[in-house]
């Protein structure tokens, strides 16, 4: 089966799928291929007319050597997951080419279809296919393939491989009829190999050093919160500098609901008094609220500027930036304090905490997502490595 005349693709096509354990603890993805306690329970593949399933480590290693030595085109759905497992069994991505049916669909749909499931893609191509509901529910419940009846698993895996092969044939026909897109599609498949290898290699991370730095940042955060609360204690109803609504009200003013004690009135309209006990003679009260007006910290000129330019008057980072640029006095200092506090918070919760939580043996293995954004931009998760910058020393 010759896919492209430029020699990039080989004639040997192998469609595969792996079923694995689900043993990685939170916050990791349970079936994470880079978590050391997970492994392949079964590997199903189709090569020409041959369909087979492998269960032993030795047979999977032999399979990996075979597809690498003979430079196969490996086909799968959400293929990076399978490749990451196979790399642990010795697969060298330099020796194979790949075709991800999910990635191809994402490209061919104009990036409208994101991370579609195998079932959704089969439906799109009008292929009869339905996953076993019982097995799907067990996977969702955190039960790995090693905890599922092997005969049921065998049927489940065989069905997945067959429909993936059928989808590939449909996509291959489309590919051959879209000459203008062929080079781009091949480049995108290659990019998937690159990011899969990036995930596998990971990034070394000093966990103990990060934990110490996180402690220091957390202490600094507490000190800053107390300092801001003390400095701005005279602002009406401002008690929590981490509350966006309180920050917005302090800056822009407005009506706030304030808890008050309300006298309980009898049927005659007179206050009801306690008839006995320690409070005898005192007026009974109940909890209520009154609306109070808070005056804005920002100047009227700044309010007019925001209104004229259509800017949102809130506590967003953009609003705080504009206030620091165009206002003066207390409003600027207040905005600076809140911005500084948020920066410390972000450093802890965006960098230190997730990086520490996701590190395995001093290495972070992020997931790079190809099929999420409508712009085609790559995204990253578990953890999000794209938030890194050169302004923060980690």
Q: For each predicted feature, which ranges?
A:
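Active-site-proximal helix-loop-helix substrate-binding element of RNase H-like nuclease domains
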Residues: 35-66, 72-175, 276
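Cytochrome P450 core scaffold surrounding the K-helix E-X-X-R motif
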Residues: 23-27, 54-56
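Conserved "right-hand" nucleotidyltransferase catalytic core of DNA-directed polymerases
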Residues: 1-24, 35, 42, 129, ...
